[in-house]
Amino acid sequence: MYKSYGERAKSHPSKVASRLLNLMESKQTNLCASVDVTKTQELLELLDKLGPYICLVKTHIDIVEDFSYEHTILPLQGLAKKHNFMIFEDRKFADIGNTVKLQYKGGIYRTSKWADITNAHGVTGAGIVEGLKQAAEESTDEPRGLLMLAELSSKGSLATGEYTQKTVEIAKSDKEFVIGFIAQRDMGGREEGFDWLIMTPGVGLDDKGDSLGQQYRTVDEVMQTGTDVIIVGRGLFGKGRDPEVEGKRYRNAGWEAYKRRIA
């Protein structure tokens, strides 16, 4: 039996996860927009249109060619406030603890200062969690959350089997900072007191894949296997699609699938 987002928010040990779950409940959306565009203006214009329909935006800030903190991040934060969504920088950290600490809080992006959520691979072990947590604590008073990459949506991904299980074990090292997984299904943990959020990429209502190995599953498919947040990218704005029309369509599909799951 699945609990509602609101019920889970009340008892969640993470302030970030609790805030996101409450936002999802009040805004009636479990849609995360993956906005992989290379210009600041396009990023901001898309998010102004998609903002009313999403709980979260997933960025790859290092592909923005005209990036600046003042002209990219500050307006992005303004849109997040205006439309009431949170920010997830899909950085996929994968180095030793000390290095990821420097990467997360420094450089030109200073990700820990503005992204509510980021993510990491488990390949280097549990030190990556501690390094990222230290960076967050040293650079901001705002709560931050980490997703571990347990599974990927691309064809031939190596994140399966024993690797996935060991990533789950790493996630258990910090109940407050690690809020869940990028995964294709429920990762369990409830019997040990964990309430992980599952965010699933590769969700599409129309296409089944692309020429570079991406594989899409439907909203209903992913919700029935334990997903909490559906991550949609090109389905919202690619191939000349209208982001407002598609945003509403995916938001409604995700919410209806969620209601069926908790009924």
Swiss-Prot record:
Q: Which domain of life is it from?
A: Eukaryota
Q: Name one GO molecular function term.
A: orotidine-5'-phosphate decarboxylase activity
Give its E.C. classification number.
4.1.1.23
Fetch the Gene3D superfamilies from UniProt. Aldolase class I (3.20.20.70)
> InterPro entries of this UniProt entry?
Aldolase_TIM, OMPdecase, OMPdecase_AS, OMPdeCOase_dom, RibuloseP-bd_barrel
Name its GO BP terms in alphabetical order. Answer: 'de novo' pyrimidine nucleobase biosynthetic process; 'de novo' UMP biosynthetic process
Q: Which cellular component terms (GO) are annotated to the entry?
A: cytosol
State the reactions this protein catalyses. orotidine 5'-phosphate + H(+) = UMP + CO2
Residues in the signal sequence: none
**Which enzyme class, named as a word?**
lyase
Keywords attached to this entry: Decarboxylase, Lyase, Pyrimidine biosynthesis
Tell me the Pfam families matching this sequence.
Answer: OMPdecase
**Active site per UniProt:** 92
Residues engaged in binding substrate: 36, 58-60, 90-99, 216, 234
Q: In which pathway does it act?
A: Pyrimidine metabolism; UMP biosynthesis via de novo pathway; UMP from orotate: step 2/2
Could you say which protein family the record assigns here?
Belongs to the OMP decarboxylase family.
Name assigned to this protein: Orotidine 5'-phosphate decarboxylase
Gene that this polypeptide is encoded by = URA3
